Each structure stands twice: as structure tokens, then as C-alpha cells.
A protein has these predicted regions:
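Secretory/extracellular carbohydrate-interaction modules
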Residues: 43-47, 53-152
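Positively charged n-region of N-terminal signal peptides that target proteins for export
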Residues: 1-4
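Short tryptophan-centered beta-strand motifs in secreted/extracellular beta-sheet-rich domains
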Residues: 173-182, 188-190
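Bacterial N-terminal signal peptides
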Residues: 7-14
Length: 257
């Protein structure tokens, strides 16, 4: 009887793991976030799962999000360079292609003031001990309205070109940015609003971990630009990733798209 019960429990455990959603916990406390050095930073006003949103105003605000586990280790190092060697808290498959997406709503604004997403960041430590960062940024200002996608590293062997892309008119009003990482060739590619832009960077060593963070702010907005919606959502689970990627691509938890 005990064996039957044990087998039943194990069976249910297997079923639950199959349906477990691939997520990331942005649960850092306000105290931790402000310990990074900016005491004016706040948590995002609205957080639902991995979606962060706020409404603009004529005041100046800055919001940020990290995971508690990652930030705790960064702060414990007591070193301004800690992010160059602190491993991410999401372990990655080290072969094949993995992908994740950002679903972003940016407001239509006049030519006064700024709204920034800088950055929506994914980064980690490569197997050679060096850091690599995949940066998605956005700025709306008096003379600019663009997304910036770039890869950076403290390893000089990194080769990166990057993209400067204007928001597009889409059917649902959201901008969709997909990052795919080829662990076989050590390359990173971009899909922007359904169009595969191809590989834009080559990093020198496999990446076996990631962390995610997000910062956004606005300032000097006109009264007509107040009360506009801004949102950034991380799409990590295969069921939420909607764009097309190279054959065999998986989500960051290793589940096929």
C-alpha cells in the first residue's frame, strides 16, 4: 500500500512539474532597491506577475525591480563592481537555443519631457567568469523616440552591433521584443514585432545563468502627457512567447516553444 501511495504522489508531482510556469521572481524589497545608492527609487506602482506598469504624471519618478535573491548577493559583496561577477539566479540550458520576450506599451507623447526604460536588463556570468548583459532600452524625448538593443560585456572578445528601432504601429498597441540566445554558437538574436532581425552579437563563452532587472523613469512632462500608461512585461514561459524563433528554440526553463 505504501508503494502505491508513493507512486501516486510521485505521479502527481510529475504532472505538476509539467504544468509549472516558467517565471522569475522580482521580489526585492524597497530597502534593498534603495541600498543600491538611489534613495528616491520606488517599486513599480502596479505589479502583476512579471508585468510592471505605471501612469505618467508631471512629477518625476523612478521605478526599479530586481529579484531578492540576486540583489541580496550583490549587496553582500559590498563592491560597486559586484554585478560583474555575481551569478544570475536563473540557471539556463547550456545547449540549443533559448528565448524570452518583452511586451512593452509606450505612450504617445508630445515633444516635452522624457520617458525612459533604461534598462530592461537580462545578464549573467559566462562560463569563463566574465559578465554579459542583454540590454533593451527605450527613450522618448524632445528629439528621440526609439528602442535600443545592445549586448555588453567586460570581456573584450564580445562582438556586438546592436539596433536602434522606432516603435511601430501594432494591432494591440504593444511593442514585442524577443531575445534568443544560441548556446551552441554563442550568439544572440532579435525578433522585433514579428520580424526576425537575425544575430547581432557573439559572446565568447557559454552562458549558464541569468538575472533580470528593470528600471524606468520620467520627468519634465507636459500636462497633456500626464496619466499615460507605460508597461513592461517579461514573457518567459513558452505558453506566453508569441513570436517565431529558429526551429527547436525553448524557453529559459528548457521547454520547447
Amino acid at each position: 500500500v505504501k508503494n502505491i501511495i508513493l507512486a501516486t504522489i510521485m505521479g502527481f508531482s510529475g504532472i505538476s512539474s509539467v504544468f509549472a510556469e516558467c517565471t522569475y521572481s522580482f521580489d526585492a524589497t524597497l530597502t534593498q532597491l534603495q541600498s543600491l545608492g538611489n534613495t528616491s527609487v520606488q517599486k513599480f506602482p502596479t505589479i502583476i506577475g512579471n508585468k510592471f506598469s505605471y501612469k505618467t504624471s508631471q512629477q518625476s519618478s523612478i521605478y526599479t525591480a530586481f529579484s531578492q535573491d540576486y540583489l541580496k548577493r550583490v549587496l553582500a559583496a559590498n563592491d560597486s563592481q559586484a554585478m560583474l561577477y555575481t551569478r544570475g539566479d536563473k540557471i539556463l540550458p547550456t545547449t540549443g537555443i533559448i528565448a524570452f520576450e518583452y511586451k512593452i506599451k509606450v505612450p504617445t507623447l508630445g515633444n516635452t519631457g522624457y520617458v525612459n526604460i533604461f534598462p530592461a536588463l537580462s545578464g549573467g556570468i559566462m562560463q569563463n567568469g566574465k559578465a554579459v548583459n542583454f540590454i533593451v532600452a527605450y527613450q522618448h524625448g524632445p528629439t528621440t523616440n526609439n528602442f535600443y538593443i545592445q549586448t555588453t560585456s567586460n570581456d573584450s572578445a564580445l562582438i556586438s552591433n546592436g539596433f536602434n528601432l522606432a516603435p511601430e504601429v501594432t494591432s494591440d498597441g504593444y511593442q514585442k521584443i524577443g531575445i534568443y540566445i544560441n548556446q551552441n554558437s554563442n550568439q544572440v538574436g532579435l525578433v522585433f514585432n514579428g520580424v526576425n532581425k537575425g544575430y547581432f552579437a557573439t559572446f565568447p563563452s557559454k552562458l549558464d545563468n541569468l538575472y533580470f532587472s528593470l528600471t524606468s523613469n520620467y520627468f519634465d512632462l507636459a500636462a497633456t502627457d500626464a496619466n499615460k500608461d507605460v508597461s513592461i512585461e517579461y514573457l518567459l514561459d513558452q505558453s506566453k512567447i508569441t513570436q517565431t524563433y529558429p526551429t527547436g528554440t525553448k524557453d529559459i526553463c528548457g521547454v520547447a516553444l
